[in-house]
Amino acid sequence: MLEILYQDEWLVAVNKPSGWLVHRSWLDRDEKVVVMQTVRDQIGQHVFTAHRLDRPTSGVLLMGLSSEAGRLLAQQFEQHQIQKRYHAIVRGWLMEEAVLDYPLAEELDKIADKFAREDKGPQPAVTHYRGLATVEMPVATGRYPTTRYGLVELEPKTGRKHQLRRHLAHLRHPIIGDSKHGDLRQNRSGAEHFGLQRLMLHASQLSLTHPFTGEPLAIHAGLDDTWMQALSQFGWRGLLPENERVEFSAPSGQDGEISS
């Protein structure tokens, strides 16, 4: 069962878990766990995608309950009328607030995109980012005697493939758990010492004008146990009040300290 964050006669939003595909492609024909099919079975009606989240990313996924609703939502996304807010845990201390305007070349998959044009130049890509908190943990990673992490809020203003992951890597603050654009040594350390076994990127909120009622709509997605455990260990509880789960209790020895 997926957590339904919002539902009316036109729209449905769910909290997509990390590791789930939004829908099957010909590359993933045998995939057992797919968001669209699960939601369809859960609510008893077809759903229509309007945007995507990468497989390892969790958070708000908004769909239409008719092809018209899906089309109108997709149009809003394409015209940048929907505000997206993400949170990430990154390598190092990213403390400033700024806008990164750094074009990105199209990232093609060797198999899925084998017929796509390869001569496209870099496309505009803009991300607003804001450092929320930092921590230094007494765990050696590589040649450093301690490990530094940062909690970052991200608002993409464009929608390039892997934009947030690539922009943070460009800033030299890759997202923890990013196997493609990240720091593999940091990824291993985060998984081993702090249970960060996934890409630490969460789609926390979508804000939009409802395409049928015209009312403002803000949808928030709660954080999973991996995220909540990280916030507890790093002393960051209370920083994401709209997304933290009140019922979560950190395992013994994991509230801002390392268990022996």
Swiss-Prot record:
Enzymatic reactions: uridine(65) in tRNA = pseudouridine(65) in tRNA
E.C. number: 5.4.99.26
Protein family according to the UniProt entry: Belongs to the pseudouridine synthase RluA family.
Gene Ontology MF terms in the entry: RNA binding; tRNA pseudouridine(65) synthase activity
Entry annotated with the keyword Isomerase: yes
Gene3D superfamilies xref list: Pseudouridine synthase
Catalytic site positions: 54
PROSITE patterns registered for this protein in UniProt: PSI_RLU
Full protein name: tRNA pseudouridine synthase C
CDD domains assigned: PseudoU_synth_TruC (cd02563)
A Gene Ontology biological process term: tRNA processing
Keyword tRNA processing found: yes
Record-linked SUPFAM superfamilies: Pseudouridine synthase
Function of the molecule: Responsible for synthesis of pseudouridine from uracil-65 in transfer RNAs.
UniProt KW keywords: Isomerase, tRNA processing
Highest taxon of source: Bacteria
